[in-house]
Amino acid sequence: MDFQLQAVDDNARAGVLNLAHSQVETPVFMPVGTQGCIKSLDAMDAQEILGAKLILANTYHMYLRPGEKVVEQLGGLHRFAQFQGSFLTDSGGFQAFSLSDNVKLQEDGIVFKSHIDGSKHLFTPIKVLDIQYSLNSDIMMVLDDLVGLPAPLKRLEESIKRSAKWANMSLEYHKENNRPNNNLFAIIQGGTHLKMRSLSVGLTHEGFDGYAIGGLAVGESVDEMLETIAHTAPLLPKDKPRYLMGVGTPENILDAISLGVDMFDCVMPTRNARNATLFTHSGKISIKNAPYKLDDTPIEENCACYACKRYSKAYLHHLFRAKELTYARLASLHNLHFYLELVKNARNAILEKRFLSFKKEFLEKYHSCSH
């Protein structure tokens, strides 16, 4: 993997990630395709309509169903899903903790029960890499010990030491395997405790292809999250991409870009879409509300998304009320277009050295009204 930093505006960064299956401009928002597809969308929607170059899939889910060996036998995740861009896969540790009963944390990994059939499994740092090799992920995440917040200092210290140990084991194993098309990212932990974040960075070896700031958006306040990002991002190598995992709102993303973050993922645009909340530059609207029953205008005037070019709010309102599956597709296409355009416009502003004014103007309009 090659990462080229093209411009810096204050702390905001614009760059290019050259991966085996695509060239990705940063800042980048990655739509979440947990099971190998974005919910309600297929690969053509992702690449042809949205223009997405990099999407996220989930190691835990692909391992349990259909199984990584099935995916490998069918040509890897790209061929299986017919997606011509790149895949980032997370390690599955978060899902093992959050979806399983009776999770047991061990020094060598995580023991968990499948949420599908109750079968028992062990994820180790090596095993999750082998799974991701079978999937042929462009970017692989190391297994980490994620802590919900608030958490005692002792638990945070255990987490960062274990996460760093697992990350460094993963790096050594990855070097032995000599797979240049499968890039490995480390994950920095430490909750909102700034000294713990510094310690996590110090314990994690150099030599990873990128670095993620993990363990946020798990119960802390927005101010605590931003303070943690502001402290952690400058500690990471300047010549490597920085990934903020699982965050978040349009405001969160712009704030994190201003603090030097390059990569984002979140289920918010698609989950909100399915639950009737649509993003516009003037704030969010709830398409299920009665005023939209006779509204013949698009979700947002001047929006170039597939849904806005073809359909009215009244039609979307009807589809949602009728529980039609087509609603989820159209609403998800709109919300993802909004997110992808947001980071694209942020990137252009960084290249033109006007990011702070762009951010200010966007937020002023975005907070002007919601319906």
From Swiss-Prot:
Alphabetized GO MF terms: metal ion binding; tRNA-guanosine(34) queuine transglycosylase activity
Function: Catalyzes the base-exchange of a guanine (G) residue with the queuine precursor 7-aminomethyl-7-deazaguanine (PreQ1) at position 34 (anticodon wobble position) in tRNAs with GU(N) anticodons (tRNA-Asp, -Asn, -His and -Tyr). Catalysis occurs through a double-displacement mechanism. The nucleophile active site attacks the C1' of nucleotide 34 to detach the guanine base from the RNA, forming a covalent enzyme-RNA intermediate. The proton acceptor active site deprotonates the incoming PreQ1, allowing a nucleophilic attack on the C1' of the ribose to form the product.
Protein name (database record): Queuine tRNA-ribosyltransferase
Gene behind this protein: tgt
Description of how the protein assembles with itself and partners: Homodimer. Within each dimer, one monomer is responsible for RNA recognition and catalysis, while the other monomer binds to the replacement base PreQ1.
Superkingdom of this protein's organism: Bacteria
Enzyme nomenclature, EC number: 2.4.2.29
Residues annotated as catalytic: D90 (proton acceptor), D265 (nucleophile)
Pathway listed: tRNA modification; tRNA-queuosine biosynthesis
Keywords: Glycosyltransferase, Metal-binding, Queuosine biosynthesis, Transferase, tRNA processing, Zinc
Coiled coil: none
Reaction(s) catalysed (UniProt annotation): 7-aminomethyl-7-carbaguanine + guanosine(34) in tRNA = 7-aminomethyl-7-carbaguanosine(34) in tRNA + guanine
Signal sequence, start to end: none
PANTHER family: QUEUINE TRNA-RIBOSYLTRANSFERASE CATALYTIC SUBUNIT 1
Homology family: Belongs to the queuine tRNA-ribosyltransferase family.
Cofactor, how bound (note): Binds 1 zinc ion per subunit.
Entry annotated with the keyword Repressor: no
The keyword Amino-acid biosynthesis is assigned to this record: no
Gene Ontology cellular-component annotations: cytosol
Ligand binding (substrate): D90, S91, G92, G93, F94, D144, Q189, G215
InterPro entries: TGT, TGT-like_sf, tRNA_ribo_trans-like
Disulfide bonding pattern of the chain: none
Cofactor: Zn(2+)
Source species taxonomy: Bacteria, Pseudomonadati, Campylobacterota, Epsilonproteobacteria, Campylobacterales
Region (RNA binding): 246-252, 270-274
Alphabetical list of HAMAP family matching this protein: Q_tRNA_Tgt
Residues binding Zn(2+), per UniProt: C303, C305, C308, H334
Database matches in Pfam families: TGT
